[in-house]
């Protein structure tokens, strides 16, 4: 029996060593897998770079990260329920430290389009986190759209078919009697104005202007033209009967502040060059603007504007819509609140192909 005595401790020592080595091997495999999964973006069966999810917010009040400030210009962020009473709130921040916990990330295209692989948020991405692609620029000024495919769940732009529609302006009914007094025609001492920052000599709008000004005097403000200090813009433009709301590129729904602010807030009749008349009429009454397509040539348009200048009744007919409607303008803060409300209205979690859609 003595030879059997030491055998038992020897077996136990070997068993413990084997178990320890096995556990160590499993730990090494696990951490190796974890590191690879963090360094390499995964493409899931749904064809995207993130897993299927219901998109349910991780917080009772959704946390939204602004990946960049639009055009790198910070703005004040009032509570959404203060902007529009009775609406829901979100915690909206530009602090990237909250990225791992954020329920949604808003990415403004302009700041990431130069080098998307380096400028977009990095992995790992929290499951259920929704990314919102945001742009107020036209496709002509949005580069590398293809690089955005497969990342985003929602779109936000001036396009009416966006998931989150953020137009440059809109009309809404007066809640009571119109607050504005009737138009003071005697204050309209000038005829036609145009404020332009990016001249673009070969652009459609500059070519049209050059033909128009051969038949009609147009006062041009902006870079390389008459100075127009920002604080005096509305005061200056309000002296004009007409304003050339010429867009820098022609795309569906691309109707910008050139109409909503420069023309309508100055109580000037907008003369528009942009998408089709029918597209404008989705957002404005047909007698609220003059479209260049209504005339065979710039010369014919010039003649019409000169006729309206002499016919007060016909000119004033372009303001009848103001008896029941008033113009409102876009703000960045309101756009972010629209994203907040959309996230709480539905939990849809899909991938959007940006390049094929935004044309």
Swiss-Prot record:
It is a single-pass type II membrane protein. GO terms for biological process: ceramide metabolic process; glycosphingolipid biosynthetic process; L-fucose catabolic process; N-glycan fucosylation; oligosaccharide biosynthetic process; oocyte axis specification; protein glycosylation; protein N-linked glycosylation. Residues 35-359 are lumenal. Residues 73-112 are annotated as: determines site-specific fucosylation. Gene3D superfamilies: Glycosyl transferase family 10, C-terminal domain. Its EC number is 2.4.1.152. Kidney, liver, colon, small intestine, bladder, uterus and salivary gland. Changing residue 111 to D: Reverse the site-specific fucosylation pattern leading to generation of VIM2 predominantly instead of sialyl-lewis x. Increases VIM2 glycolipid product. N-glycosylated. Changing residue 244 to V: Found in individuals with plasma alpha(1,3)-fucosyltransferase deficiency and no clinically relevant phenotype; complete enzyme inactivation. It catalyses: a beta-D-galactosyl-(1->4)-N-acetyl-beta-D-glucosaminyl derivative + GDP-beta-L-fucose = a beta-D-galactosyl-(1->4)-[alpha-L-fucosyl-(1->3)]-N-acetyl-beta-D-glucosaminyl derivative + GDP + H(+); an N-acetyl-alpha-neuraminyl-(2->3)-beta-D-galactosyl-(1->4)-N-acetyl-beta-D-glucosaminyl derivative + GDP-beta-L-fucose = an alpha-Neu5Ac-(2->3)-beta-D-Gal-(1->4)-[alpha-L-Fuc-(1->3)]-beta-D-GlcNAc derivative + GDP + H(+); an alpha-Neu5Ac-(2->3)-beta-D-Gal-(1->4)-beta-D-GlcNAc-(1->3)-beta-D-Gal-(1->4)-[alpha-L-Fuc-(1->3)]-beta-D-GlcNAc derivative + GDP-beta-L-fucose = an alpha-Neu5Ac-(2->3)-beta-D-Gal-(1->4)-[alpha-L-Fuc-(1->3)]-beta-D-GlcNAc-(1->3)-beta-D-Gal-(1->4)-[alpha-L-Fuc-(1->3)]-beta-D-GlcNAc derivative + GDP + H(+); a neolactoside nLc6Cer + GDP-beta-L-fucose = beta-D-Gal-(1->4)-[alpha-L-Fuc-(1->3)]-beta-D-GlcNAc-(1->3)-beta-D-Gal-(1->4)-beta-D-GlcNAc-(1->3)-beta-D-Gal-(1->4)-beta-D-Glc-(1<->1')-Cer + GDP + H(+). It holds the Pfam family Glyco_tran_10_N. It is found in: Golgi apparatus, Golgi stack membrane; Golgi apparatus; Secreted. InterPro entries: Glyco_tran_10_C, Glyco_tran_10_N, Glyco_trans_10, GT10-like_C_sf. The chain crosses the membrane at residues 15-34. It is an enzyme of class 2 (transferase). Glycans are attached at residues 46, 91, 153, 184. Pathway: Protein modification; protein glycosylation. One of its GO terms (cellular component) is Golgi membrane. It comes from the Eukaryota. Homodimer and monomer. Monomer (secreted form). PANTHER family: 4-GALACTOSYL-N-ACETYLGLUCOSAMINIDE 3-ALPHA-L-FUCOSYLTRANSFERASE FUT6, ALPHA- 1,3 -FUCOSYLTRANSFERASE. This is 4-galactosyl-N-acetylglucosaminide 3-alpha-L-fucosyltransferase FUT6. The gene is FUT6.
């Amino acid at each position: 029996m003595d030879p059997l005595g030491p055998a038992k401790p020897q077996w136990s020592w070997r068993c413990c060593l084997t178990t320890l080595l096995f556990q160590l091997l499993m730990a090494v495999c696990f951490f190796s897998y974890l590191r690879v999964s963090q360094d390499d973006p995964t493409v899931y069966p749904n064809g995207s770079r993130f897993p299927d999810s219901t998109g349910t917010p991780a917080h009772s009040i959704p946390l939204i990260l602004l990946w960049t400030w639009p055009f790198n210009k910070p703005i004040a962020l009032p509570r959404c329920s203060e902007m529009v009473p009775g609406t829901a709130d979100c915690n909206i921040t530009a602090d990237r430290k909250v990225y791992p916990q954020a329920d949604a990330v808003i990415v403004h295209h302009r700041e990431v389009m130069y080098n998307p692989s380096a400028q977009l948020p990095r992995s790992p991405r929290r499951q259920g986190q929704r990314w919102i692609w945001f742009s107020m620029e036209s496709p002509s000024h949005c580069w590398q759209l293809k690089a955005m495919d497969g990342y985003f769940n929602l779109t936000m732009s001036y396009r009416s078919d966006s998931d989150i529609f953020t137009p440059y302006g809109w009309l809404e009914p007066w809640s009571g009697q119109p607050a504005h007094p009737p138009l003071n025609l005697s204050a309209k001492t000038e005829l036609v104005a145009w404020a332009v920052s990016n001249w673009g000599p070969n652009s459609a709008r500059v070519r049209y202007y050059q033909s128009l000004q051969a038949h009609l005097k147009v006062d041009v403000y902006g870079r390389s033209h008459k100075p127009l200090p920002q604080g005096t813009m509305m005061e200056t433009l309000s002296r004009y009967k007409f304003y050339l709301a010429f867009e820098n590129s022609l795309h569906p729904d691309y109707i910008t502040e050139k109409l909503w602010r420069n023309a309508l807030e100055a109580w000037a009749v907008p003369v528009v060059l942009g998408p089709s008349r029918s597209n404008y009429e989705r957002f404005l009454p047909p007698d609220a603007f003059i479209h260049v397509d209504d005339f065979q040539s710039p010369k014919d348009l010039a003649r019409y504007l000169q006729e309206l200048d002499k016919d007060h009744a016909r000119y004033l007919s372009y303001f009848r819509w103001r008896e029941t409607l008033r113009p409102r303008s876009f703000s960045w803060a309101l756009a972010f609140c629209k994203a907040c409300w959309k996230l709480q209205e539905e939990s849809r979690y899909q991938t959007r192909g940006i390049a094929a859609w935004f044309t």
